[in-house]
């Protein structure tokens, strides 16, 4: 996967955004409860700098390295 961005999820690959693992956390208190959303992005795969070009090729990063 060194030549492709694993975070591409869009019709126009030049406008790809990061897609990571999302999970929810429910915090319960004696008086109230609320839901928080957290997102974990695989920075170890692309250093958080991965840009997708047309065809979903990786530009300006070390995806998968």
Swiss-Prot record:
**Tissue localization of expression:** Expressed in leaves and rachis.
Q: For this UniProt record, give its keywords in alphabetical order, as a comma-separated list.
A: Metal-binding, Metal-thiolate cluster
GO process terms (BP): intracellular copper ion homeostasis
What is the protein name given in its UniProt record?
A: Metallothionein-like protein 3B
GO MF: copper ion binding; zinc ion binding
Family to which the UniProt record says this protein belongs? Belongs to the metallothionein superfamily. Type 15 family.
Where are its TM segments located?
A: none
Organism per entry: Oryza sativa subsp. japonica (Rice)
**Functional note:** Metallothioneins have a high content of cysteine residues that bind various heavy metals.
PANTHER family the UniProt entry points to:
METALLOTHIONEIN-LIKE PROTEIN 3 (PTHR33357:SF3)
């Amino acid at each position: 996967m060194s030549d492709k961005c694993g975070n591409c999820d869009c019709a126009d690959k030049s406008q790809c955004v990061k897609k990571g693992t999302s999970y929810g956390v429910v915090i319960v208190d004696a008086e109230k409860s609320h839901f928080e959303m957290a997102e974990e992005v695989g920075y170890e795969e692309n250093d958080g700098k991965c840009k997708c070009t047309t065809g979903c090729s990786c530009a300006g990063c070390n995806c998968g390295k």
